[in-house]
A protein has these predicted regions:
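ABC family nucleotide-binding domain
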Residues: 2-4, 8-208, 212-216, 220, ...
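C-terminal boundary and immediately downstream tail of ABC-type ATPase nucleotide-binding domains
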Residues: 230-259, 263, 267, 271-278
């Protein structure tokens, strides 16, 4: 379980102080897929960086399985982070390492014996559908394949939590659907708690059990995904839903090919949990 209590994060000093997060309070249950939804500049990235202490909060607590990680000293951070995997929009792979050696990298840092780390990496590559890609390099992979390598690497230390920071923003709609399907599979089969940071209503709608809407560094709305989207209470969420409807109307398919593409792109976890990730 993740409990965030009265979290504040400010940048700068004195008159130049900018409060990025104001009194954030959240409880994320173990095994949940929890979405943090917001527009650019809303505070999403600041929150996720505080959650794994890439940045320390100005005040407040982040309690994971009963332990307040904000009290951990810098020299002990590496141990805390082994329990928190993270993937990013830009994949962040090592271009000079093979796919296999990208996945083994966190295990190398933990001094895991070579045989065990390669066994773990090969298992994870099979899990994400890349068992035949171990000796390739990132430059030889598509964007979706690179993100799957990043997912495998994030799982290397068998974390109980994975933070996904705009993990599908650089991908097309079809590949996004495939990656969301994979993340849902990981959540179900490995019982990994997923925290999905996104600006996309479609992503939140299709994978998240619950969603917190963040705006101006504050949680303005929180609840079950379907209920929240059916009956939004905040101005920002109502505006985003209205904008989405308008955009969908403008992009309405005009032929069978477009309809087929739309159906494929919306074949996300809640609609197609059993589909194989290509």
């Amino acid at each position: 379980m993740i409990q965030i209590e009265h979290l504040h994060k400010s940048y700068g000093k004195g008159s130049e102080t900018n409060e990025a997060l104001h009194d954030i309070n959240l409880t994320i249950e173990s095994g949940e897929v929890f979405g943090i939804l917001g527009s650019s500049g809303a505070g999403k990235s600041s929150l996720v960086r505080c959650m794994n202490l890439l940045e320390r909060p100005t005040s407040g607590k982040i309690i994971i399985d009963g332990n307040d990680i904000t009290e951990v000293k810098d020299k002990e951070l590496a141990k805390v982070r082994t329990n928190i995997g993270m993937i990013f929009q830009n994949f962040s792979l090592f271009q000079q390492r093979t796919v296999l050696r990208n996945v083994t990298f966190p295990l190398e840092l933990n001094h895991t014996p070579k045989k065990k780390r390669e066994e773990r990496a090969n298992y994870l590559l099979d899990l994400v559908g890349l068992k035949d890609f171990a000796n390739r390099y990132p430059s030889q992979l598509s964007g979706g394949q690179q993100q799957r390598v990043a997912i495998a690497r994030a799982l290397a230390n068998n974390p109980s939590i994975m933070l996904c920071d705009e993990a599908t923003s650089a991908l097309d709609s079809t590949t996004t659907a495939q990656i969301l399907n994979l993340l849902s599979k990981i959540n179900r089969e490995l019982n990994v708690t997923l925290v999905i940071i996104t600006h996309s209503l479609a992503v939140a709608r299709n994978i998240c059990d619950r969603v917190a809407m963040i705006d101006g560094g504050r949680i303005v709305e929180l609840g079950d995904t379907d209920t929240l989207f059916a009956n939004p209470q905040s101005d920002i969420l109502r505006t985003l839903i209205a904008d989405e409807k308008q955009e969908n109307h403008r992009a309405k398919p005009t032929n069978k090919s477009a309809n087929a593409s739309t159906n494929e792109a919306t074949n996300t976890p809640k609609n197609a949990l059993n589909n194989e990730v290509k």
